[in-house]
Each structure stands twice: as structure tokens, then as C-alpha cells.
């Protein structure tokens, strides 16, 4: 009986040791890719995520695929190519999941960044219409406040890296949370 109890404790410890225990801070080295037009935040976010995972897909190629065109890589970019959209990871050999009008929980943020060691894309919906997509590449908790590290492809050809509170990631003045693309991985 004692041997069986000992074996059960060992099995439990082995199981628990395989669980991910996120640290207070974690980041992933995601290269900032500014959006190349005023509307390609979605393509820049797709480019950042896929580039991090080892596949370089340009923003104009994503626009060509999204809009059924072949001229979005031209200079200047034709106006018909300059539209909003969503990343289409499946067209480039990736699987992903996405939320609808909901952010990832803090535990999910930690799991994606620390445990799975990958970034994820998120978007805000502006109160007046339209929206904006960015990448979360890290997180930290300081003095009881949760923050996320963001690669923001705005402004065109510039971009920005910043840290925002988790609460601001969820919603804020002038915007609500839209869709997140997470668990992005090769098929």
C-alpha cells in the first residue's frame, strides 16, 4: 500500500513538472514591421507573426492574396490594394485560432508568450468604425499591474514598440476589443 501511494505521488509530481508556470515577465524577439500603407496594419501584423515563425510573407503579397490581385507590390501601390483585412495564416501554411469581440485572458496571454513562446495578433475596433491590428510580443507584472509589450505597425513606414496595461489591451476610451489571432503555428 505504501509503495502504491509513493508511486502515485511520484506520478503526480512528474505530471505537474510538465505544466507551464509563467514567470512574471516574458518577451519574444519579434521584429517590428511597420505597415507599408495606411490600411495594412493587418498585413504588417501577419508579416511579424509569420516572420517570427520562420516564414517571410510580405505585406503586398498578403494584399494580393486577400484581394485577388497581382499588382499590390507595384510602386505606387494601386488604391484598390489599400484596404483593411484580416491575416489569412492558413494561406501560408499556418493554423491559428481567433476570438470574436473578445481579448485573451491574462492567463492566455502568459501561455502564448511564455509557455508556447510565440506572439499573437490582436485588434481594436474604433468607436467611429474601422479598427487597428497589432502584435503582443511580451508581458510583465509590475507592482500588481499587468502590462503587454506591443509591436504597433502604425505609423506607415515607421511603427512603434510600446508597453500598455492589460486593461488598455482589453478596451479603452474610443475603442473596444475586436479579434485576436492566437495559437499561430505551422500546419
Feature-to-residue mapping (PLM):
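Bacterial N-terminal signal peptides that target proteins for export
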Residues: 1-9
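Proline-rich low-complexity regions
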Residues: 4, 31-32, 43, 119, ...
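Generic low-complexity segments that are intrinsically disordered, proline-rich and/or Lys/Arg-biased
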Residues: 7, 23, 30, 77-79
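N-terminal non-cleavable signal-anchor helices
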Residues: 10-11, 58, 165
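C-terminal motif of bacterial Sec signal peptides marking the signal peptidase cleavage site
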Residues: 17-18
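Active-site nucleophile-adjacent alpha helix/oxyanion-hole segment immediately C-terminal to the catalytic cysteine
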Residues: 23-70
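Conserved active-site-adjacent core of cysteine acyl-enzyme catalytic domains
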Residues: 25, 50, 61-187
